[in-house]
């Protein structure tokens, strides 16, 4: 990647907090500029140098800052409404951690839906394949 991007994170619950704490956005050429939440105890604080603002400030923040990417970690009940705010205010791409598929038909917005269940199912499949290989090998060795 030959240029960096500025991003915001919406939803500083378990997944959002874990991403902020453990994922190196900078190593991927992304500056996490701000995070947004509705929880009063988080608003106005900073986490790892990232200010946490009220979700009510999201639209104004996007209008006044050059932000290309959004990391979406909100409950599925509000995901569509938050996505609408993001897409109407200049966000070019969404990294979606909600537990619903986000699609933007006829939209230039890029959406990467992250599915933890798909990853777990893939792992389960590969473990099953490996166990089948071990069983077949053990059966051959018994003969």
Regions found by a protein language model. Name each.
Residues 1, 27-29, 64, 88:
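Alpha-helix termination/capping residues and helix-transition junctions
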Residues 3-39:
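Glycine-rich adenosine-cofactor-binding loop
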Residues 20-22, 47, 82:
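A short secondary-structure junction signal
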Residues 42-45:
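A glycine-biased structural micro-motif
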Residues 49-141:
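Phosphate-bearing ligand-interacting subdomains
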């Amino acid at each position: 990647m030959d240029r960096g991007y500025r991003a915001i994170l919406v939803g500083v619950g378990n997944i959002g907090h874990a991403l902020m704490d453990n994922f190196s956005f900078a190593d991927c050429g992304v500056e996490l500029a701000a995070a947004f939440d509705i929880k009063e105890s988080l608003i106005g604080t900073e986490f790892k140098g990232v200010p946490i603002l009220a979700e009510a400030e999201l639209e104004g923040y996007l209008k006044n800052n050059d932000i290309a990417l959004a990391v979406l970690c909100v409950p599925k009940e509000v995901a569509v409404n938050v996505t609408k705010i993001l897409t109407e205010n200049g966000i070019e791409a969404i990294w979606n951690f909600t537990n619903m598929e986000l699609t933007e038909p006829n939209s230039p917005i890029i959406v990467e839906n992250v599915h933890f269940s798909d990853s777990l199912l893939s792992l389960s499949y590969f473990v099953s394949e490996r166990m089948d290989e071990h069983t077949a090998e053990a059966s051959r060795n018994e003969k």
